[in-house]
């Protein structure tokens, strides 16, 4: 009996030691997991395609003197296309006056960076005006200068309403957002600045 009892106690001790070890390992992994998960969420908010284009954006940012805005332009790419397609910066209209004329990503990025360099210059360094002008066109800069003097959400909505209401062919526009319909502001994206700035802030964490 004594031998069996000692053997049973020994087995119990071994099992307990194994369970304690497993518990410690699982607890350690649980503590580590949140940080890893946060990193994964952070990375997936910005698509891998956008990250892959970063060297190209940096190259043309240097060429056009806007290197400090690389994160902004990557954020704009994320908003425009998520980095997908042959025109990731959606630069065709500023390049040739119509959609779909660019079918080469590098040309899209070159034109997009160049166009942004022009908007930031004409906006006298007002970043939000420059960003919204990338979406609305440079006419938004003149509108701001004649009205509010700086970017506001209200100014973006009013400009979109004006351009949509005075258009001779409204069929070419679609409200990108449900919330824009209530304002009848279907020209461009009235919340472009808000979303681009959110992407930029996410990029800045990396």
Model-derived features: positions:
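Non-catalytic cell-wall polysaccharide-engagement segments
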Residues: 2-51, 63-64, 99-107, 118-206
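Peri-catalytic and regulatory segments of divalent metal-dependent proteins
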Residues: 53, 57
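Extracytoplasmic/periplasm-facing segments of secreted or lipoprotein envelope proteins
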Residues: 58-66
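Short, functionally critical alpha-helical segments immediately adjacent to catalytic or ligand/cofactor-binding
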Residues: 67-84, 91, 109-113, 130-137, ...
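Short, solvent-exposed loop/turn and secondary-structure capping segments
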Residues: 86-89, 144-145
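Short linear capping/connector segments at secondary-structure termini
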Residues: 89-97
């Amino acid at each position: 009996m004594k031998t069996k009892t000692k053997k049973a106690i020994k087995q119990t001790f071994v099992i307990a030691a194994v369970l304690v070890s497993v518990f410690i390992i699982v607890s350690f992994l649980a503590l580590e997991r949140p940080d890893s998960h946060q990193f994964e969420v952070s990375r997936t908010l910005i698509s891998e395609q956008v990250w892959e284009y970063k060297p190209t954006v940096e190259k043309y940012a240097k060429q056009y003197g806007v290197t400090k805005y690389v994160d902004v332009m990557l954020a704009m790419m994320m908003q425009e296309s998520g980095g997908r397609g042959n025109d990731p910066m959606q630069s065709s209209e500023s390049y040739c006056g119509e959609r779909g004329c660019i079918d080469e990503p590098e040309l899209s990025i070159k034109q997009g960076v160049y166009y942004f360099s022009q908007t930031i210059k004409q906006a006298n360094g007002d970043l939000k005006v420059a960003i919204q002008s990338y979406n609305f066109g440079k006419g938004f800069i003149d509108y701001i200068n004649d009205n509010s003097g700086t970017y506001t959400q209200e100014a973006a909505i009013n400009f979109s309403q004006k351009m949509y209401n005075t258009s001779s062919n409204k069929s070419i526009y679609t409200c990108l957002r449900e919330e824009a319909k209530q304002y009848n502001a279907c020209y461009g994206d009235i919340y472009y600045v808000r979303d681009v700035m959110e992407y930029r802030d996410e990029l800045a964490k990396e």
